[in-house]
């Protein structure tokens, strides 16, 4: 996962499960919120070669778009119920607005109502079959349901789309899904591909480090988790992983430094509690 609808680097609590919204204007563009909506009949009727302008946007679509922007803002802030209220108004204004059905799917995915999420993503695809971001989201939903073969196949279909430009997001989600399915070799391969496209992404860095730590490849795990912990995106989870990696390498100085940062910056965290109890293998 994230914006377009993708994984978000600024809020990565729950690193092992990540389909989050991306940020700002890119999110709105990915939803089809910005500018005229080329999928609407009115927009399609504009003469070939003409520039689509705000005047081409039907009134109902404009109302739906504004409501969708509000819903998205609330969703990103974690106000899921308020986001759903705004989204309902968007769909009342324009029931065939594909981006609204996509966001509806994400909302119900967050609420773990998988049947409604599935219905919403599939409705969005009926309205706009070429939207790779919706196909990505549906693949992630299937992953949450542990429908591994279907999920992997849909991720691969997204990645095979020649016009798709969010490879980092989808390789990351595919790798996370494969890790959940116990396919560590494939997971590592796809997380590394994601890392090639987006080397600073904290979700990728953490999960690569965690995967390598679990299989005993401590030097490579150290390389990834150190990069993360030296960035402003470090958190309790990454510090704790760093502590365990350095402990495995018998690097006492680095282990102490990370331990101090963990306790100082995140004193009430579960990871800080585990450290103080010496629960390194939980």
Show which residues each predicted segment covers:
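Residue-level recognition of tetratricopeptide repeat
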Residues: 63, 97, 131, 165-167, ...
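N-terminal leader/linker segments that initiate helical-solenoid repeat arrays
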Residues: 37-88, 92, 276-282
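Structural marker of alpha-solenoid helical repeat scaffolds
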Residues: 59, 93, 127, 161-163, ...
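TPR alpha-solenoid repeat register
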Residues: 100, 134, 168-170, 204, ...
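Terminal, low-structured helical/coil segments at or just beyond the last alpha-helical repeat
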Residues: 43-55, 230-282
């Amino acid at each position: 996962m994230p914006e377009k609808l993708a994984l978000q680097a600024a809020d990565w609590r729950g690193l092992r499960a990540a389909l989050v919204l991306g940020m700002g204007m890119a999110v709105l563009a990915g939803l089809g919120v910005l500018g005229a909506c080329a999928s609407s009949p009115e927009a399609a009727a504009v003469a070939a070669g003409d520039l689509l302008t705000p005047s081409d946007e039907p009134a109902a679509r404009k109302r739906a778009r504004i409501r969708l922007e509000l819903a998205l803002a609330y969703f990103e802030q974690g106000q899921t119920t308020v986001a759903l209220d705004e989204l309902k108004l968007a769909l009342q204004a324009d029931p065939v607005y594909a981006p609204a059905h996509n966001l509806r799917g994400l909302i119900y995915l967050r609420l773990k109502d998988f049947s409604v999420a599935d219905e919403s993503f599939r409705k969005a695809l009926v309205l706009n079959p070429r939207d790779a971001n919706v196909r990505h989201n549906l693949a992630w939903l299937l992953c949450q349901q542990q429908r591994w073969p279907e999920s992997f196949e849909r991720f691969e279909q997204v990645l095979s789309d020649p016009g798709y430009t969010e490879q980092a997001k989808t390789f990351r989600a595919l790798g996370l899904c494969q890790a959940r399915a116990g396919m560590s070799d494939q997971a590592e391969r796809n997380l590394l591909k994601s890392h090639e496209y987006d080397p600073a992404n904290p979700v990728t860095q953490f999960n690569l480090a965690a995967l390598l730590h679990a299989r005993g490849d401590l030097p490579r795990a150290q390389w990834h988790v150190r990069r993360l912990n030296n960035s402003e995106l470090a958190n309790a989870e990454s510090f704790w992983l760093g502590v365990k990696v350095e402990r495995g390498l018998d690097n006492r100085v680095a282990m102490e430094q990370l331990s101090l940062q963990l306790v100082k910056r995140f004193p009430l965290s579960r990871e800080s509690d585990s450290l103080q109890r010496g629960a390194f293998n939980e």
